[in-house]
Swiss-Prot record:
Compartment list: Membrane
Cytoplasmic side: 101-116
PANTHER family for the chain: TRANSMEMBRANE PROTEIN 213
Keywords attached to this entry: Membrane, Signal, Transmembrane, Transmembrane helix
UniProt-recorded name of the protein: Transmembrane protein 213
Gene: Tmem213
Extracellular side: 36-79
Length: 116
């Protein structure tokens, strides 16, 4: 308990620890979410699904990718969506770290609701 008082008196030690913890938790969360989407998509194919008559789902053994690549424009593939999600996560992490940095610089005498 005595050591926690020492750390609270000297905020210089606390500035890098929360940033590292937030960065580490963001990396773990993004990894967990990317692995979770792969497992959920593989589980959805295992469920019993009865396609409607007259749809392309009835042609399970036909590869439509070559035909689609001739007709359709290229879009964001599955890795592009993951990269976009990671990019947005880093953007929000940056905002969180800026807020944490601002809170760490406040002294007890200053009110916490100052204009930005």
């Amino acid at each position: 308990m005595a050591q926690s008082g020492v750390f609270l008196r000297n905020p210089g030690h606390l500035t890098s620890a929360p940033q590292a913890a937030l960065l580490f938790s963001l990396v773990l969360t993004s990894f967990h979410l990317s692995c979770g989407t792969e497992t959920s998509s593989s589980n959805s194919t295992l469920s019993a699904h009865h396609p409607d008559p007259g749809t392309l789902e009835q042609c399970a053994n036909v590869d439509f990718c070559p035909l689609a690549s001739l007709c359709c424009r290229a879009s964001v593939d599955e890795y592009g969506w993951i990269a976009a999600a990671v990019g947005w996560s880093f953007w929000f992490l940056t905002l969180i770290l800026l807020c944490v940095d601002k809170l760490m610089k406040l002294t007890p005498e200053e009110p916490k609701d100052l204009a930005a």
